[in-house]
Amino acid sequence: MRTSQYLLSTLKETPSDAEIVSHQLMLRAGMIRKLASGMYAWLPSGLRVLKKIENIVREEMNNAGAIEVSMPVVQPAELWQESGRWDDYGPELCRLTDRHNRPFVLGPTHEEVITSLVRYEVNSYKQLPLNLYQIQTKFRDEVRPRFGVMRGREFLMKDAYSFHIDKASLIETYERMHAAYCAAFTRMGLNFRPVQADTGSIGGTGSHEFQVLAESGEDLIAFSDTSDYAANIEMAEALAPAGERPAATAALTKVATPAVHTIDEVAAFLNVAPAAIAKTLLVLGEEDEHGNQAVIALVLRGDHELNEIKAEKLAGVANPLTFANDEQIKAAAGCDAGSIGPVGFAGRIIADRSAAHLADFVCGANETGFHLTGANWDRDIASYEVADLRNVVEGDPSPCGQGKLLLKRGIEVGHIFQLGTKYSEAMKASVLNEGGKSVTMEMGCYGIGVSRLVAAAIEQNNDQYGIIWPEAIAPFEVAIVPMNMHKSERVAEQAQQFYAELKAAGVDVLFDDRKERPGVMFADMELLGVPHAIVIGDRGLDNGVVEYKCRRTGEKQEVAISEIVALLKAKLGR
């Protein structure tokens, strides 16, 4: 491609509304332009990257035995009502009506559509397993679109759905898709981790996220420094402290703590470490037959954070997790929020494993302006349960039993689920088994954020000059930068020759034939992130050489004119 025949819309300045590096560089490199909040037009360079990622995903899906289909973006509301998700989804589900006032949705995902399709096309176990996928635009009306294509309202996604006669078959395909995802992200040159994850609104049982490690990531992941264990912070298990709980030695004492509310304030006032304090949070339980909700006390160590996903999965706790308001706190504990404690609390008490290991600890006295010191489980709190309630912290022992946990930020680029029969049962998708009996199909679903991958790759691969693309997904593999070619016929001829040879070898090459200063050309090629560059000048041609430059390492070397094409083909594996 010649730049004179190409739309190379680079910007010198960073747009003020671009918050993270990938958004800034995608705008500056002329990859995308904003159309509306969370909606972007893809310019040629951006689309070239998007298509390369899409092709890698498609190849790995085909290798895994999945079959490509295409389904409508607009979906009948009745399918969502049938599955039960019409009421589960909030404003992020874009609902619309046609001219006949029939309700539809803009699809954020396609579980309902694919289940409806398969229930009418598949009726025998002989047609299973079946794995169907598509690569298609989705729409979610995000409350706060941000970070460019990282969290847009419109996005390109690969979604696959598998159907099975039994759980064993589902697990087999799930593992095959897990391997396909790893292969795809490895081919893209990404540093990623598959991690255990929560199923969220999609539902089902087993689930893994694929996280690209990046400081700008919205997710926090925990992984062992020794083994392959990795989990989203929501799912990472916090083990109980080793050994027996220390024996009680202090007497229970009530102390005045006026105008002291937070853990840090209590620690400073009483001159104790936050880890020696038990903090108590009150949440609501599930509604009983009369619509009443009990108030439940969750007790954690003062230096630990509540994991709300773990908490709302506890039996009897309202889902979604709902914290008690001031009025409910007053009624249940008889005090303000800053003075709640487990001693004397009349309701159900659930202590985190680490909190349950405390002895002689500080806690609220259930009297505004007072705390207790020397509190102890069993002696002072007779009835309580113990559960894993907290987020893990760096240095915790890994749940796998090997090594300690490290915490890193990640960008979720893929998510796979063992759905089980959540959708197939609700939508009556069944087949006849070998014995002629009707059985509900087991399902899996597998998503990849194709457009998000573009941004995630940039977050991992950039420097002060611009993007540093992995070769497999770069918009161009080689840039030809001729110095003053419009004033030097032999520079122009040599550039034309390299361009023809590289194109004939199947290399994606960008020939910068603009009438621009060399500094502008170099800056644009570095901003765009082309992995390899040939710089041609009269001085080098006098000596029979050109300059080769590697974008990732910054390496420069003079190479004989007769050898440069072979060198590039070798580096690109041609």
From Swiss-Prot:
Keyword ATP-binding assigned: yes
GO molecular function: aminoacyl-tRNA deacylase activity; ATP binding; proline-tRNA ligase activity
A GO cellular component entry from the record: cytosol
Alphabetized Gene3D superfamilies for the sequence: Anticodon-binding domain (3.40.50.800), Bira Bifunctional Protein, Domain 2 (3.30.930.10), YbaK/aminoacyl-tRNA synthetase-associated domain (3.90.960.10)
Subcellular location, record wording: Cytoplasm
UniProt keyword annotation of Metal-binding present: no
Major subcellular site: cytoplasm
InterPro entries referenced in this protein's UniProt entry, alphabetically: aa-tRNA-synt_IIb, aa-tRNA-synth_II, aa-tRNA-synth_II/BPL/LPL, Anticodon-bd, Anticodon-bd_dom_sf, Pro-tRNA-ligase_IIa, Pro-tRNA-synth_IIa_bac-type, Pro-tRNA-Synthase_IIa_type1
GO biological process, one term: prolyl-tRNA aminoacylation
Keywords: Aminoacyl-tRNA synthetase, ATP-binding, Cytoplasm, Ligase, Nucleotide-binding, Protein biosynthesis
EC number annotated for this UniProt entry: 6.1.1.15
CDD domains cross-referenced by the UniProt entry: ProRS-INS, ProRS_anticodon_short, ProRS_core_prok
Catalyzed reactions per annotation: tRNA(Pro) + L-proline + ATP = L-prolyl-tRNA(Pro) + AMP + diphosphate
Assembly notes: Homodimer.
Protein family membership: Belongs to the class-II aminoacyl-tRNA synthetase family. ProS type 1 subfamily.
Domain notes: Consists of three domains: the N-terminal catalytic domain, the editing domain and the C-terminal anticodon-binding domain.
Function: Catalyzes the attachment of proline to tRNA(Pro) in a two-step reaction: proline is first activated by ATP to form Pro-AMP and then transferred to the acceptor end of tRNA(Pro). As ProRS can inadvertently accommodate and process non-cognate amino acids such as alanine and cysteine, to avoid such errors it has two additional distinct editing activities against alanine. One activity is designated as 'pretransfer' editing and involves the tRNA(Pro)-independent hydrolysis of activated Ala-AMP.
Name of the protein in its database record: Proline--tRNA ligase
Record organism: Aeromonas hydrophila subsp. hydrophila (strain ATCC 7966 / DSM 30187 / BCRC 13018 / CCUG 14551 / JCM 1027 / KCTC 2358 / NCIMB 9240 / NCTC 8049)
Organismal lineage: Bacteria, Pseudomonadati, Pseudomonadota, Gammaproteobacteria, Aeromonadales
